Amino acid sequence: MQFLRLGLRVVGTRRYATPAGPTTSSVAINRVAPEATVGVREAVLWPGRPDMCRLAEDEQGLHLAATLGDDQVIGVISLFVDGAAARFRKFAVLEAHRSAGVGSRLLQAAESEAASAGAAHIECDARPQTAAYYEKRGYAAAGPPFAKYEGSEQLYATMRKPLA
């Protein structure tokens, strides 16, 4: 297996009430600095496009990383809360670790953080091929598909979930 190795700077730890099955028991979810997310973002979401892997608002977000050991980042998610609305962006898990519960743990941790911050709902812009993943976790489409990036034919849908 190939891992991304970074000089990981953990900025906070918190235990999340998420199930840890046998395949995810060695995975830790930690708050990290924004720069710790870029390697996985590029590897999964925008290969060869580092310019698309940083967000202008990264410094205002809360960033979570799934790690193996001390510095093997295998998944990331970035959360932005604005009053009652929370939005996550740049959610990615390395291919070798998909279907093992890593993404579910990251998503549950982001939802927990959003609820703790007082958000009434959480949402993301999802590609059509990922809609079923979000629907299975209680999200529903909140509007018609749209093109997110100028000049791109890739469509997205806003997926939203109420937080209890």
What residue spans do the PLM features occupy?
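A short beta-loop-alpha structural element at the N-terminal edge
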Residues: 24-38
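Active-site rim helix/loop that mediates acceptor-substrate recognition in acyltransferases
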Residues: 38-73
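Conserved beta-strand in the GNAT
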Residues: 65, 72-80, 85-92
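Conserved acetyl-CoA-binding loop-helix of GNAT-fold acetyltransferases
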Residues: 93, 99-112
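Conserved GNAT acetyl-CoA-binding A-motif
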Residues: 113-127
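Conserved catalytic-core motifs of GNAT/GCN5-like acyltransferases
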Residues: 123-125, 140-158
